[in-house]
Amino acid sequence: MAESAASITRHLRIHGLVQGVYYRKSMTEAARRLGVQGWVRNRQDGTVEALASGAAPAVQALIDWAHEGPPAARVERVEVAEAPACDAQGFEQRETV
């Protein structure tokens, strides 16, 4: 399924102090407020990974949020890459991989 001009999907990898600080829960709440679909999960290497799909301004707002995260987080960098369209309904926390 091709992305429309109004809808984008991005893969994020967040580095820094981002586990054990409610990052996933906070990102899930932010994504739901913005109407972004997808998921977020911890990785065993200490990063957080997410897939965000939706209207371009909403996805960009979530990416902007990812650079800050919740108050206890210390984000060092956020890698963002284009991704294939996502057919997720809603935004969920997934298990660590």
Swiss-Prot record:
It is an enzyme of class 3 (hydrolase). Disulfide bonds: none annotated. InterPro entries: Acylphosphatase, Acylphosphatase-like_dom, Acylphosphatase-like_dom_sf, Acylphosphatase_CS. Keywords: Hydrolase. It comes from the Bacteria. The active site is at R24, N42. One of its GO terms (molecular function) is acylphosphatase activity. Its EC number is 3.6.1.7. Belongs to the acylphosphatase family. This is Acylphosphatase. The lineage of its organism: Bacteria, Pseudomonadati, Pseudomonadota, Betaproteobacteria, Burkholderiales.
